[in-house]
């Protein structure tokens, strides 16, 4: 799999329809609060396609309880698209499970992609080195599309990325 994400977090709002594709299939978006190992909470946009297992689970949760506040285990893919010259990054949920007692891996991302541009390195005001990468991750469906996923590497990893990675290199 070229693009895999696993998240555990709390649904913050009710899914709202955000688009309909050419085939008439609707897409819904909601935000989830996902806690890092450090305790920092990230707010991530989750997109669910109509008539998928993930959508059906949300519909079931809505029937028997409240989606907002539900603890969800989400697996899916990172998706990107350009909207008015701004990169929109979201998680496309392939499966969702309500689980108030989940104790496994809570945040995991695995992507395999190609370096799109020369790796710039910069120093933060605190003196930390950062390399900003953009990976082109090919979708595994028949669309022949790619998602351009921004990634950050820190300190020694940033230095090695600058020294060793070239445009077109495939990394995981």
Regions found by a protein language model. Name each.
Residues 1-172:
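Single-stranded nucleic acid-binding surfaces, predominantly the OB-fold ssDNA-binding core
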